[in-house]
């Protein structure tokens, strides 16, 4: 990220600390991404399909939601896409992928399938505001998508995706 910005990586680390802290500072939201990711480390893998959307929808529906929406719109309209991709690759895929890497070598694609579903939910519900989806209670969305998320995380993968 530092290279893309044309600055010394040591300075970025000095002023912002971790990549998570840099991401939080860059999007100007008073939430540390690790506050969202850390509880997922404690959750049993068999419950992540429910835990992930529950946590993310609660965040988006909180008082921080409008700022998150504005930030996402801004990031998607410029060079921020690379930054968001880097965050997902370094944080979400690495954190989640290492927990669901069975058979070995599938953790990354499993985490990316989950991320694609959750990004789609956020886009449809908060950015594009597709009705009636945008107005559904969060719990209904969680109950509907959790089985698919869990299948991505722990289910059998189609031929060609597993090594």
Regions found by a protein language model. Give the residues of each.
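Helix-turn-helix
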Residues: 1-21, 25
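Short helix-capping/turn signature of helix-turn-helix
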Residues: 16, 73-78
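Short, basic, alpha-helical segments at the C-terminal edge of helix-turn-helix-like DNA-binding modules
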Residues: 28-33
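Hydrophobic alpha-helical connector segments
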Residues: 35-72
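Short alpha-helical scaffolding segments that buttress acidic/His motifs in well-ordered protein cores
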Residues: 56, 68-75, 114-118, 122
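Short alpha-helix boundary/capping elements
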Residues: 60, 64, 76-80, 92, ...
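Hydrophobic/aromatic-rich alpha-helical bundle segments in the mid-to-C-terminal region
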Residues: 81-86, 99-152, 156-163
């Amino acid at each position: 990220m530092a290279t893309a910005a044309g600055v010394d990586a040591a300075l970025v680390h000095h002023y912002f600390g971790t990549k998570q802290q840099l991401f939080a500072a860059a999007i100007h939201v008073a939430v540390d991404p690790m506050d969202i990711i850390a509880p997922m480390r404690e959750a049993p893998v068999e419950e992540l399909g429910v835990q992930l959307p529950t946590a993310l929808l609660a965040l988006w529906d909180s008082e921080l939601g409008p700022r998150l929406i504005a930030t996402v719109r801004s990031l998607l309209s410029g060079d921020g896409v690379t930054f968001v991709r880097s965050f997902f690759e370094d944080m979400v895929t690495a954190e989640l992928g290492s927990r669901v890497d069975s058979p070995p070598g599938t953790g990354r694609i499993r985490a990316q399938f989950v991320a694609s579903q959750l990004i789609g939910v956020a886009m449809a519900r908060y950015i594009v505001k597709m009705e009636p989806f945008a107005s559904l209670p969060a719990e209904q969305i969680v109950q509907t998508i959790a089985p698919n998320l869990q299948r991505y995380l722990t289910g059998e993968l189609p031929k060609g995706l597993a090594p």
